[in-house]
Each structure stands twice: as C-alpha cells, then as structure tokens.
C-alpha cells in the first residue's frame, strides 16, 4: 500500500519572493495593480514578468516573447507596459520599507531632502539610443518627485538644477556636477537651497563684499585630518550679477585618503598628459562643500553629516544606477518612466537584501556560483539567472 505524499516544485522564483516585504500581495491588492487586466490575471506571474523586464535588460517585446514561449505570462508588450504603470505605486510602497530597513535615515529628524542626480541609459543593440535620465528623489521617504529624459549629448542636457522644478523651501543635495553658478542661482530665485560638492574650476567664489575668495589660503589653515572649518562666501548670479551668499565647508581627509587622491591626480597626469598644479593637489586633500543652507539650522557639523549621509545613500544607489544603465525605457512618458525607476530601485534593493543576508546565495540547493568571486556583477548575474531559471521551469510539457 502506497502512502500519500506531497509533491511540490520549489522554483528560484519562490526563493526571490521570500525576500519581498511579507505582505506584498495584500499591498498589491490594495493598490489594485491588476485592474483592467484582460489576459493573464495572476499577480505572481505578472510580477515575475515585470521583474524579468526590470532586471535583465530586455525590451518589453523581448520580455513578453520570452514569457509567452515559456508559458509563464501571456500578454502583449503594450499590456505589460500598462501593468508596469499600475505596479508603480506598489514598487514605491515596497521601496520605502526596504530602504528604511537597510539605511540610516536623514541626519536631521523630520527633515526631507531632495537628492538630485542623472545617469546615462544606453539601450542595447547597434541602433540603441543613448539617453540622459534626470531624476529627483526625496529622502528618507524615497519618493520620485520628478523625472526628465534628454539626449545624452548636446546643448543644455548636462547635469543642472535647471532640469528640475523647485518649490520654496526645497533643500537640494547633489554632487559636483551640479556645482554651477547658473543652476544654483536658479534654485535661489525659486526660494530653494543647495548643498553641493565644490567643483573649484566650475564655480567662481567671492567674499561677501564681492572680492576674490582666497580658497587656497583658507585651506592651508586646516592641518589635521578630520579637522573642519567653514567660511562665509558668495557666488555671482550670471544673469543679474547679484551676489548670492553661501558658505564653504571643508574637512581634511585622512592620510590614506589623501594618498589615494594624489595617486588619482598622478593617473590623470599620465592619461591626459598635463601636470596638475600644486593647488590641485592641495584641494584634493579636502572634501569641500558649497552650501546656501541656513547656518543656524544647519551648522558646520550638520552640513558634514548631510554630506556623509548623501555619500552613504550614493553607495546604496550604486547598484540602482548600474541597473538604470541597463535596459530599455518603457516610453518617454513621465508616468511610465517613474514606474520604471521605482521598479529598477526595487530590484536593486532586493539584490542588496539578498547579498546582505545570504551573501548572494538564494538557497542551499541552488548555489551554482560558489567558486566565483562575490562581486557586485556576480550578485546581479545570480539574480538574473534565478529569474530566467524560474521561467524555464514553467515551460509546459509537449
């Protein structure tokens, strides 16, 4: 007499879903993500198809062709794009939970900051287009409040605050690519404030009374690693010629970081065949920030804490930006671009979560890369392989 036994198929998709927020299906129902679906109305299959699109660098057409042949998900690429838009608020919701659980939040209690950034997206193939994707995320709640798509090359497409709408009281943080007088002046005229890494060749500094600001002589007064100082300064609005008050905040790097900075200068000298000046070597011994944030609310220590926090956030975004550079934009419409961005960020955080807890291994029975290095690229390969393997096991028998 044969005893009854259960027989189940545990796919790598089950492994991946185990790292989703616990109540993600209930959240999906609350967001009504399947509203209007006409063909495949399975939540898991739709999510699986979207994850393949977001993580594997496929176009919507390639994704739906692959999922249709495997029997996983039967729908058109147009319908999948509409599902992506519907899933956008769900990805946003889950991003907030994952991000808050993995990262230290704002250094100022109750303070919201806008992180401004851009990245180039090269669509695959010999005729693939290259775009520059400008986006703004509010932190710590991880809400995308603006996106803009431009050509990667041409006039007016570089990193600039002028690509973004600014509201009175906005506090923006950005890297040195945004350290330009016209962009900072634009934010100031709109009633906003900036905190940017100084690009000393792109921004002319003045004293509050309009004289030349002697940055080098100021920096020479900081002699100890970890020592920080600030000075009042101003920049000039290129349009009105009016002075915009601000501060220079500088902290001297550790001796190890200074050695690395000098080494980088030497590499630039070899690569570009020019000799950096002594002033360039000195400036690279410091982290230098220009800010228009209010001094009373944002003293020197707080400005440095904000920059340190922004640097930590940038590390968290590193994988996210590498995923943004991989794949096809769904459309050039902001609604679908935002959903695409939220989905990419969710994939990045999911991989980060797997790496953090399991060092990239999904399960004891599905660890096919033990002999490889544990680098970021291999983490992504594991994730991609798990998604594709999960598609393979759904292929119907003939």
What are these regions (language model features)?
Residues 60:
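Helix-turn-helix DNA-binding elements, focusing on the entry/boundary residues of the two helices
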Residues 89-103:
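Short Lys/Arg-enriched helix C-cap and helix-to-coil transition segments
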């Amino acid at each position: 007499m044969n005893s009854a036994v259960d027989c189940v198929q545990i796919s790598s998709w089950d492994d991946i879903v185990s790292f989703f927020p616990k109540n993600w299906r209930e959240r999906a129902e609350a967001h009504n993500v399947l509203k209007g679906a006409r063909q495949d109305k399975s939540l898991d299959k739709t999510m699986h198809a979207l994850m393949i699109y977001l993580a594997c660098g496929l176009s919507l057409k390639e994704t739906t062709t692959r999922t249709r042949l495997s029997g996983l998900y039967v729908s058109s690429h147009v319908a999948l794009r509409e599902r992506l838009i519907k899933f956008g608020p769900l990805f946003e919701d889950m991003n907030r939970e994952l991000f808050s659980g993995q990262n230290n939040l704002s250094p100022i209690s109750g303070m919201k900051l806008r992180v401004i950034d851009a990245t180039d997206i090269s669509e695959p193939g010999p005729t693939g287009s290259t775009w520059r994707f400008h986006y703004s995320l509010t932190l710590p709640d991880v809400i995308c409040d603006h996106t803009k798509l431009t050509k990667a090359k041409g006039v007016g497409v570089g990193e600039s605050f002028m690509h973004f709408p600014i509201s009175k009281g906005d506090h923006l943080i950005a890297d040195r690519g945004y350290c330009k007088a016209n962009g900072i002046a634009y934010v100031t005229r709109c009633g906003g404030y900036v905190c940017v890494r100084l690009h000393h060749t792109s921004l002319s500094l003045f004293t509050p009374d309009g004289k030349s600001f002697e940055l080098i002589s100021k920096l020479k007064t900081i002699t100890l690693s970890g020592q920080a100082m600030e000075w009042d300064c101003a920049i000039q609005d290129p349009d009105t010629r009016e002075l915009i008050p601000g501060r220079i905040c500088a902290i001297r790097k550790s001796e190890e970081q200074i050695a690395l900075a000098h080494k980088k200068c030497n590499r630039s000298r070899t690569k570009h065949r020019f000799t950096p000046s002594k002033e360039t070597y000195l400036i690279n011994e410091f982290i230098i920030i220009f800010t228009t944030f209010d001094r009373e609310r944002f003293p020197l220590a707080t400005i440095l804490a904000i920059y340190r926090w922004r640097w930590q956030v940038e590390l968290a975004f590193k994988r996210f930006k590498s995923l943004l550079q991989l794949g096809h934009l769904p459309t050039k419409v902001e609604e679908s671009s935002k959903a695409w961005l939220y989905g990419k960020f969710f994939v990045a955080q999911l991989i980060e979560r797997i790496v953090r807890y399991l060092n990239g291994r999904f399960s004891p029975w599905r660890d096919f890369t033990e002999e490889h290095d544990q680098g970021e690229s291999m983490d992504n390969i594991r994730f991609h392989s798990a998604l594709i393997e999960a598609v393979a096991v759904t292929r119907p028998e003939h």
